[in-house]
């Protein structure tokens, strides 16, 4: 060391220099600390923040959509909230959603860092990943779920709808379980090549609980992503991380069990074409950058999304029919004119049943199954008015506020299917989009076409065959249904409520029984599994596996 260097430590220079350095360092740390929870400069304004907490304590984190809607009324269609020390821009205006998520979709397609939620999925969950991992998953989903491909699954959906009608005859009070079996069976047959023949099958609840665990525990552990510096501390300090790892192990066992069952049946020559079988074939041929457990997760992603979104929307629709019998009656009158009592509705009837379609659209608006879509993040600067939203800033599509905006939907609390007259394509991803159940832009739900067909088939058949009434107690008083009594999560639906489901006539009952008996004899084997995969599905999945 040179004498000049040593001079730094000599008195009288060393003490003032060291003191100044410490003061500057403490000041820098203090300034940084005082800014924790405060809104960064240059972002759209929003509600006042609190030191450290930001806006976190002002929000019910299990039901944030309600507070976000109130703030939209106060601060405008685009505002910024601070969840801890992370900024999120909440977008609630129709024009603004179209601008930020559709027109600027190339810059608003990422997911924000979700390290805690990814902890519950061993680091890989396609819907929360970015970059090449997400693109690989998306390409697979698009191949099996694009508009043309989704049409091929119609035989699966028709058969499951017919069982649903029969199940409603057999056990009408268990209507919620029948809905969940329907949606899970369509998904299971697609993904694993095996039907769910009974609502008591534990895989139905297991599938729904798997996604609920991710959502519910994700809220409890969200503070770790809200204050990212906490990840620098040992994981053992946070009990919620232990819970997350337990959920990850449970999830891994579940998806691997389904995936391995397909491989086992393939080796025994019993497999039917399925998404997981196509994934396994693709992996055998070499799928760069995708491991086998990741392949299993890509397939499972379709299973959970298809099951829960469809089931939740149908459950919410049942409540709408209980509370709005006039809409139900009008839809049934239309079905009676077009279909009549001597046959079931078909997918081809959709164009001739505009009011039924409007009922379906209104049900999705009235209670939005995915009220905040899934959070996004800017992957490039996003421009809104005079503001530039920088890369990595969180973006929240406030579908709940959009669907309850009185300027777009007058009297939004009322169930009015007529508001959708002349708007059959309101959910189509684009500049004219009005309905955002499935999101918008580059991250729109890939299963939208399949889900919309399921909603039409189930609702048109249900209206054709059954009356749905509000249940009554022993004193004949109607049992209330609160449309805000929701199960929390990414995907919301009403908590359990009773409904009275009865066949419309003996003629409707007889036709339901006869058609299901024919399905058992013609389409299904003695274990009520498909005797053979419909040709269109087999060809599609064979192509995907190459």
UniProtKB/Swiss-Prot annotation:
Residues that bind heme, according to the entry?
445
The biological pathway it contributes to is:
Polyketide biosynthesis
Q: Name one GO cellular component term.
A: membrane
- Describe how expression is induced or repressed: Expression is controlled by the asperlin biosynthesis cluster-specific transcription factor alnR.
User: Would the keyword DNA-binding be found if you checked this record's keyword annotation?
Assistant: no
Give the matching InterPro entries. Cyt_P450, Cyt_P450_CS, Cyt_P450_E_grp-I, Cyt_P450_sf, Cytochrome_P450_fung
| Key words, A-Z | Glycoprotein, Heme, Iron, Membrane, Metal-binding, Monooxygenase, Oxidoreductase, Transmembrane, Transmembrane helix
- Bilayer topology term: Single-pass membrane protein
Localization terms from the record = Membrane
| EC number(s) stated in the UniProt entry for this protein | 1.-.-.-
What this protein needs as a cofactor is: heme
Family membership noted in the UniProt record: Belongs to the cytochrome P450 family.
Query: Protein name, please?
Result: Cytochrome P450 monooxygenase alnH
**Lineage in the entry?**
Eukaryota, Fungi, Dikarya, Ascomycota, Pezizomycotina
